[in-house]
């Protein structure tokens, strides 16, 4: 079987940032109000949309009512990935 014939693994996708913001708004939150409630700065909370930040991920997920593993499935898959050991010789 060649490389082109191998089936690709389907990776879980993270939610799009607009979807996260829309869900927050549906639940009565803005990033600024959530940051104030969580006693963190707005800029700190905003970084969760682009970078991995477990504490802020939990804050956003709790406000939406969905586990962070669902919202950022790709990040959690990367965190929980075990390296495969290969013989060098």
Swiss-Prot record:
Underlying gene: nlp
* UniProt KW keywords: DNA-binding, Repressor, Transcription, Transcription regulation
Instruction: Tell me one GO molecular function of this protein.
Output: DNA binding
Q: Which family does it belong to?
A: Belongs to the ner transcriptional regulatory family.
- Where's DNA bound on this chain? 57-76
The organism of origin for this protein: Haemophilus influenzae (strain ATCC 51907 / DSM 11121 / KW20 / Rd)
Q: What does this protein do?
A: Negative regulator of transcription starting from the Pe and Pc promoters of Mu. Also negatively regulates its own gene transcription.
Keyword Transcription in the entry? The reply is yes
What's the protein here called? Mu-like prophage FluMu DNA-binding protein Ner
């Amino acid at each position: 079987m060649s490389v082109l014939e191998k089936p690709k693994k389907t990776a879980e996708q993270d939610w799009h940032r607009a979807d996260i913001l829309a869900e927050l708004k549906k639940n009565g939150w803005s990033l600024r109000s959530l940051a104030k409630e969580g006693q963190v700065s707005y800029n700190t909370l905003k970084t969760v949309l682009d970078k991995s930040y477990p504490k802020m991920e939990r804050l956003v997920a709790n406000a939406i009512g969905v586990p962070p593993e669902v919202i950022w499935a790709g990040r959690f898959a990367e965190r929980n990935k075990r390296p495969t050991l290969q013989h060098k010789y």
